[in-house]
Amino acid sequence: MSSTTTSQSVSPFELFLRRFKREKLAILAGSILLIMVLMAIFAPFFLSQGLNDFDYDKILMPPSAENWVGTDLYGRDLFTRLVYGARISLSVGFLSVTFGALLGSVLGIMAAYKGGWLDTIIMRAADVLFAFPSFLLAIAIVAVLGGGIVNVIIAIAIFSTPTFARITRSSALAVLNSQYVRAATTMGASHFRIMFVHILPSTIGGILVYFTMRVGTSVLTAASLSFLGMGAQPPSPEWGAMLASSRDFIAVDGYMYLTLYPGLCIFLTVLCCNVLGDGLRAALDPK
């Protein structure tokens, strides 16, 4: 009897935490991402060199005790630029996916709740966007809007929206005829309250998992656009822009560190986001 009472008194959030604590790799990935975020935020407090401190006596210096990952072709400290670059790369990833998630969630829940012609229009529009490879769609959008970080965020948000709409719609349809939604309808709750107070919370799990994974993909997409000259422009320390400015040294012996470390930052971010997303999925939806 006591065990039954104890199990009933545990909240869903507590159950989630218990399951998530078993996901050691996800916790490690989340810790690495947290360290990267904190380093990016507090960069001015622990970095001794400025973002664009030129030192022509230290041009293309290899990693050393003074310059941990070396210097670039202008004598700037690469570690400093990588940390400041995390501000841009992580911000682009987070903001673009946030905007896509907000818009997609609203469209998805409206499609599920209203149904009919509105559902058809929203889902067919999503199908049109799904017909194009996401990266090519991002290139097309940036080509129309012009280069720059803001337009990259807009482009990534646009092609992130359909998937969030699909996830939200699917989750919302699963609870649309549940007892608590029917009770809210019977009590005269407004459509807005039913959609965003009673239905939306049940979709958060799927949204959160995809959101986490999508941030990593968005960082990679933004870096790719910058590498092609369509995103952040030099002297921006965005990781893709750093790769672009050092592309002539990719195959040059002794200077591979110029592209190695920005590439590792991108790889580590994408990997950690995917591992964290897998851990969240396992904790939210145990099989």
Regions flagged by a language model, labelled:
Residues 76-91, 95, 115-123, 176-177, ...:
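Amphipathic cytosolic juxtamembrane alpha-helices at the membrane-cytosol interface
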Residues 1-105, 109, 117, 135, ...:
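Gly/Trp-centered helix-boundary motif
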Residues 161, 165, 218, 269-273:
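Alpha-helical transmembrane segments
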Residues 110-111, 141, 168, 181, ...:
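Hydrophobic alpha-helical interface/terminus motif in multipass membrane transporters
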Residues 136-140, 144, 148-157, 207-242:
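Non-cytoplasmic
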Residues 68, 72, 78, 102-104, ...:
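Generic hydrophobic transmembrane alpha-helix motif, especially the helices
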Residues 36-37, 101, 127, 143, ...:
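Residue-level recognition of pore/gate-forming positions within transmembrane alpha-helices
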Residues 92-96, 111, 126-127, 155, ...:
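Alpha-helical transmembrane segments of multi-pass integral membrane proteins
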